Amino acid sequence: MINWLHLPDEIWLLIGNFISDREICCLAFVNTRFLNLLSYNKINQNLVLECAIEVDNIYIINKLIDKTDVNGLKFVMRWSALHGSFQIIKSIIRKDHNNDLLDLHAINWSIESNHLHISKYLIDKYNIVIIPESAFIYGRLDIIDWMFSRQNQNNANKKSTIKKTVDFLKSKFISHDYFYDSMIELACLYGHVHVVQYFIDNQCSVRQKWLYYSCLSGNFDLVKLLCKNGCRIFSNRRLINTAITGGNLDIVRYCLLHSKIDLAQNNFAMKIAIKTGHIGIVRLLVSHGSDIHFDNGECMIIASRGGFANIVKFFLENKVYMSEKVLKIAAIRGYLDIIKVFIKYASACMSNINSVCKSNGSMVVDNHINYIVNITRNFNMRKILIWSLINNRINIVTYLLEIFPKLREILNQIMYQHPEISEKIDLDSLYKN
């Protein structure tokens, strides 16, 4: 069996022309004899450093960092922080006598990847005063608490320490309310209950604005915590709309329960629910009086644009007006599920009509049902077929031909009458199906 590691260098240099730069780096780290591959192939130094950090190869890094400029070293710091390579960071920091390598990205990356020992080391080294925003984004209470304690380490009263530090930061950055306004809002936006609870426990007054970010986060426990500690659900549309955007059904139900908003006068709330695709919220709003029949079936068009077949089905069952535009949008964008929902619903309507006619001899057909059934006539299906063909939606065309075999004759006519369509579609794929 051939030992590939002992092939002559000339062979490896030749192989280097046929493999990726990252694979060359990996070869170099397997055996230091292959390091000449790196220089021979003129590989980007950042890629070499990146790979070396990933495998924690101190030898390669020490060999390269002496020739690396400040920006390159910052890159090494960031990548090492992300991968938790503490020894590499300490090795570089020892050579940084003028704080040239101060880089908040490295601190944020270490917090993001939860290598908090690296975060604390860098914060201490460069005497960072402001708590990095990533601690609030990722809910690293360890870092937040440690930095507060670090600000007033001689004070034995923890609650007093927190409040004094908050007041200090507020006074220092009052021009844009850097800490107190923005950072805790981030914790609310990302739904970190434990971080918000920490500030409440340490006598920080709760702001009404936090409730909006909590509704947006979709964390129901956080919303209840803030309401329990002074936030109020006013009867305004903005909070309801924010909760709907967040997409948590329990939060929306909770807000509706504690407010007196007339949803019949608030079509915007329904539009948001449809655009975000939350069928549960759509049903909830309807049960609370929200209108779905406004603007000649605008609801149906919005649902079709988003490709939400379950919402389209719900609207059909509730007899929302449906124009051909709904099917046109679905055909153009390739939303086969919406086409299927419509045809299935139309077939059910037709079956009901036929069964009643057989038993009673006649029946009064609802206008909505009559309209839906008429859309499925060949002429209207022809339109859907053309829209699908023009936009190369072969899956929809295939489905239509399966359900309506007579459309194949119409398809041939369309191809003959409109040769420009045949140029835009994959005919082989179509006829294969």
Swiss-Prot record:
- Work out whether the entry's keyword set contains DNA-binding: no
Per UniProt, the keywords (alphabetical) are: ANK repeat, Repeat
Which PROSITE patterns does its entry note?
Answer: ANK_REP_REGION (PS50297), ANK_REPEAT (PS50088)
The protein's matches in Pfam families, at most eight in alphabetical order, are given as: Ank_2
Q: Which domain of life is it from?
A: Viruses
- The ANK repeat units are at 44-70, 71-101, 102-131, 179-205, 206-235, 237-264, 265-294, 296-321, 322-351, 380-409
Q: Does the keyword Repeat apply?
A: yes
Q: Which SUPFAM superfamilies match?
A: Ankyrin repeat, F-box domain
Stored PANTHER family:
ANKYRIN REPEAT-CONTAINING PROTEIN
Protein name per its UniProtKB record: Putative ankyrin repeat protein R784
Origin organism of this chain? Acanthamoeba polyphaga mimivirus
